[in-house]
From Swiss-Prot:
Taxon lineage: Bacteria, Bacillati, Bacillota, Bacilli, Bacillales
Cofactor annotation: Mg(2+); Mn(2+)
GO MF terms held by the record: AMPylase activity; ATP binding; magnesium ion binding
HAMAP family hit by this protein: YdiU_SelO
Descriptive protein name: Protein nucleotidyltransferase YdiU
Amino acid sequence: MTKNNEAGWNLDNSYATLPHSFYTEIPPTPVSSPELVKLNHSLAISLGFNPEELKKETEIAIFAGNALPEGAHPLAQAYAGHQFGHFNMLGDGRALLIGEQITPSGKRFDIQLKGSGPTPYSRRGDGRAALGPMLREYIISEAMYALDIPTTRSLAVVTTGEPTYRETKLPGAILTRVASSHIRVGTFQYAAARGSIEDLQSLADYTIKRHYPEIEDPENRYTALLQEVIKKQASLIAKWQLVGFIHGVMNTDNITISGETIDYGPCAFMDHYDQGTVFSSIDTQGRYAYGNQPYMAAWDLARLAESLIPILHEDEEEALKIAQDEISKFSVQYENLWFLGMKKKLGLFSNEEQDHSLIEQLLKMMEKYKADYTNTFRSLTLNTLENTPLFDSSEFKEWYKLWQSRLERQDESKENAYEMMKNNNPSIIPRNHRVEEALEAAVTNGDYSVMEKLLEALANPYAYATDQEEYCVTPAPTNRPYRTFCGT
């Protein structure tokens, strides 16, 4: 254990108070020559760390799993999951929770090492991670944070000095991931599958205390827990859809109880608007396509409700009815939040009957003309309609007149409407070709400057700054669709 606490470590281990079936205590596997390649200064400060101390060899050794800070209690979490619809017992196959950092404001965050070596849940995996996917998770999770979308975050990336073997030999790395917690829908499925009502209750009680203390007292606390998770996920999925984010692997083990986005493996942001957009190389049926995400979230939440049935009510029929009633509320909550978000994207303060139609007409035209999702709303926000097939079409010009007259009918000024649009339409997103460009420079050439410049731009997605304009350019047309892989 490293005892130098000038770095600011302040660890607790509340997860280890759960029954032992929920985890396995195991130390990380040391690596040969760790090197810090990325540290998140602002996140470090918010967690109560001293960033300069974290750059020292003693702390780099912690990020690499070669040492443990005082108070660490490394463990791999057990969970289950429906992966593309098929149920499996799973667990952290290459990640370890080393503890929960208590911040100066009293908040609690999991500190997890990802790529820290094999665990009892590794199956045939080596427990390691490659540098490219770890940097990719860093870039996209930080972009999501800047977009004000709940997400796990990345504190540090270290290279291990050792190769990782996938299809080819790749440089190894470990990511330090930060999350409100790593409790998933799959964690509840795991408890339910094991058949211990006591364990299921322990997990639910722990989750309420940690994430939803305001529902500690009511009689129907487990129903209230389900309600809160449904609300959080409805809000999260609406936010994904509004910025064109496609997660790619919405298995139940990747749906957090806290409502944070987790697992940035095959995710990507949509370029031209298409409800059927899929990037993941393994999602051959389009199960997790952009337009399917709200439905898949409801499906995943139904699996949570199923897992909770033994503790929702002592009468199984009544418990089933409660579960069905609560799940049925997801679609209405999601639709309302998405619609409200779309109105903001178009500068609409008030309500008019034809607002739904106005939004749907625009989206249909965007799909028909393969218009870039982000740049269409960016152009509307700037009120500069460049020569594109969409903007040149007679049907868009007709729609534009309807939209402008709609803006004129509301009490708020057009100036206020455009300001609201600016705050809800990101000027830039982590476009796939720019992310790949940054990863190629870092992994192949050891040049992190491209990534740093990209991260700097992505940190202010609503700034509409002139020096960001190069990141607004869409990728060159190609016959080869962009594909993502589950490297994270």
